[in-house]
Amino acid sequence: MTIVLNPGKVTLSQLEAVYWNGEVSKLHHDTHFAIKKGAERIAKIAAGSEPVYGINTGFGKLASIKIDADNVVVLQRNLILSHCCGVGVPLAENIVRLMMTLKLISLGRGASGVRLELVQLLENMLANGVIPVIPEKGSVGASGDLAPLAHMAAVMMGEGEAFFQNIRMSGIAALEKAGLCPITLEAKEGLALINGTQTSTALALAGLFRGYRALCGGLLAGALTTDALMGSTAPFHPDIHILRGHYGQIVVSETLEKLVKDSGIRAAHLRDDDRVQDPYCIRCQPQVMGACFDLLIAAAKTLIIEANAVTDNPLILSDDTVVSGGNFHAEPVAFAADQIALALCEIGSISQRRIALMVDPAVSYGLPAFLAKNAGLNSGFMIAEVTAAALMSENKQMAHPASVDSTPTSANQEDHVSMACHGARRLLAMSENLFTIIGIETLVAAQGIEYRAPLKTSSLLQSVMEYLRKNIDTLKGDRYLASDLHKAHILVSEGRLLSVLSETIFPQLKPK
């Protein structure tokens, strides 16, 4: 299925489909007029004698140097090659596809001045699976994501490297195998390709999508734990949360109520329960997870605006004037990435605390130590809980805001930068850790619920338990647990446990 992009109106669900499903995208044909008009305006300037930044001048600190019309094409080529300075391992294919899609959206607004054939080459690369090799490091998030986007642009010129049919090869070889021809960049086109926030935004969107999946997985795991610990569901009463008024808290409480509804375990201890209140990691799930959801919603609002934005420089305005500005500065993306990082950290933190409760016989309300059968001879989930603690601690360190850092670059011309790119990139590592933490909690909670037999959990949670046990057996004695943790990670990270239930049970990630 091909996603047709209408720049300015692209939705979060369309971008999710690109990231999770590898959907191919192209611009709506209505964009062609604006693209052609912008290209004509730039061509006219390039043919004239008046110096205009980015069209017939140098770049950055060298902006005052006028470039002759005969060298404009050389200027663009040199720009791309000199900026291919990325280092580190290549970004994943779905990240690069998302980057390329975001660049299409930006160019499709017609304010960048590139030719239609350049845009169509980018579309054809996506359609034919030519995926540029883009090293993950090298951008400070202003003046745009220069280095990573230069690696993308290099392939369009027949330079650099690309993956084609999962094989890494030269950029020109990948184009040829796909039946495509490299393009010679004309005035401003190189700058339009690399001046933008598309790498940072793609990484932040990936973090958002993964964070939302983790949040839903955390709600499911938290509901399982609540039943495993015979916790009270009274704190999920909707009126409590309506009185406070936070949207995330309200919808999270509704989700938790749905998940534990009709639980036989809960019904068995509605009366004569000597515990007045549960620990906060059980009782305050709506408050904590709701606040995390609100952070994700806020980040989503920022990122969908940025995804539809024109972020290169200079720009062609509606009156045909060409004006230099600073839309390439990724501060909004950096802030959004920091918000997502805080949410990922807290989702993992409260999950780890629930694991700790379940493995401790002093506070687990009758569960055996470490959920082990014949504890002592068997260690059960003792070290799985330690692993969760280690991952939680890693995430705490990575949650420190990246946006508070800045360092001058480019001979002090670019003297304040956003650090959005690595601020967004760390979300991938944080979410990987978080998927494992939630996977561990799910395993421990499922074991705990089984210890409550013959009492049964809710019908919704029972369906999740049945799916889980088709993939991972109950821990009846110590075994090689790494395999279980790996399988649990996959079930959470790929959303397989969530797919057992209707998606309407969970809060919907829709920016307000």
Swiss-Prot record:
Keywords from the UniProt entry: Cytoplasm, Histidine metabolism, Lyase
Annotated Gene Ontology cellular component terms: cytoplasm
This protein's record includes keyword Ribosomal protein: no
Compartments where found: Cytoplasm
Uppermost EC category: lyase
Record-linked HAMAP family: His_ammonia_lyase
Name the UniProt record assigns to this protein: Histidine ammonia-lyase
Organism annotation: Bartonella henselae (strain ATCC 49882 / DSM 28221 / CCUG 30454 / Houston 1) (Rochalimaea henselae)
